[in-house]
Amino acid sequence: MSTDLHWQTQGQGPDLVLLHGWGMNGAVWQQVVERLELHFRLHVVDLPGYGHSAHLHAASLEEIAQQLLEHAPKQAIWVGWSLGGLVATHMALHHADYVSKLVTVASSPKFAAEARWRGIQPQVLSAFTEQLSEDFHTTVERFMALQAMGSPSARQDVKNLKQAVFSRPQPNPQSLLAGLQMLAEVDLRDHLPHLTMPMLRLYGRLDGLVPIKVAQDLEKVLPASEQFIFTQSSHAPFITEPESFCHQLLSFAGK
């Protein structure tokens, strides 16, 4: 069995890496891959523990990074969704020669809420952790529903997510647990000023996991970064508003 991560590479143009979120896999990008492959050489990865990389595992952001480094293109645009945004930001901070531009999608440097920081309530994350040990298939489905909640096309969004995710092998429970732990514990806020490359932050106005207040707070920390808010989207704007999403990436890449 391969010890390498599963990478899917297609298209022509500048290198662009797509990283999925917790409980998902690279198939979630399929809708936008069809549009973006005309403009970029795309590198879609299944992170350790997910999809075709389900037999692998990584317990921290740096362990994930080390596995990515084995086949990642240098000087690429990195696009990370949700937990994938934490991974992409970690790559940009610690392996900057691989990242020419950074794009985070519905992501936060700290997902768990605390006193003056908006985010996912810690009890929600601990409930997911408990449910995971009982029935991880249902837990992942619940998380999909939570991601789409609020979007006018929520039902269709969930259907698209399910179709994509269940088209590949199921994630391994150990990696799901490690991912939840990262969402609960990682805090990159103090490291963000060290980012040197251009950055674009994309958000869904209706997102219940990464509240729009996070976008405003990060504007102060990252004054040189750009941001865009998708008005009709919740946590998965590339599924709800794929054309607008691709437009944002193309515009940012061309700068």
Curated annotation (Swiss-Prot):
Catalytic activity, EC: 3.1.1.85
Name of the top EC class for this enzyme: hydrolase
Main localization, broad class: cytoplasm
Segments forming domain AB hydrolase-1: 16-242
SUPFAM superfamilies: alpha/beta-Hydrolases
Catalytic activity of the protein: 6-carboxyhexanoyl-[ACP] methyl ester + H2O = 6-carboxyhexanoyl-[ACP] + methanol + H(+)
GO molecular function, one term: pimelyl-[acyl-carrier protein] methyl ester esterase activity
Residues the entry annotates as binding substrate: W22, S82, L83, F143, M144, A145, L146, Q147, H235
GO biological process annotation, one example: biotin biosynthetic process
Pathway: Cofactor biosynthesis; biotin biosynthesis
Pfam family, one: Abhydrolase_1
Listed InterPro entries: AB_hydrolase_1, AB_hydrolase_fold, AB_hydrolase_sf, BioH
One GO cellular component, as annotated: membrane
Subcellular location: Cytoplasm
Keyword list, A-Z: Biotin biosynthesis, Cytoplasm, Hydrolase, Serine esterase
Active site: S82 (nucleophile), D207, H235
Quaternary state and interactors: Monomer.
Family to which this protein belongs: Belongs to the AB hydrolase superfamily. Carboxylesterase BioH family.
HAMAP family according to UniProt: Carboxylester (MF_01260)
Protein's job: The physiological role of BioH is to remove the methyl group introduced by BioC when the pimeloyl moiety is complete. It allows to synthesize pimeloyl-ACP via the fatty acid synthetic pathway through the hydrolysis of the ester bonds of pimeloyl-ACP esters.
Protein name, as recorded: Pimeloyl-[acyl-carrier protein] methyl ester esterase
GN (gene name): bioH
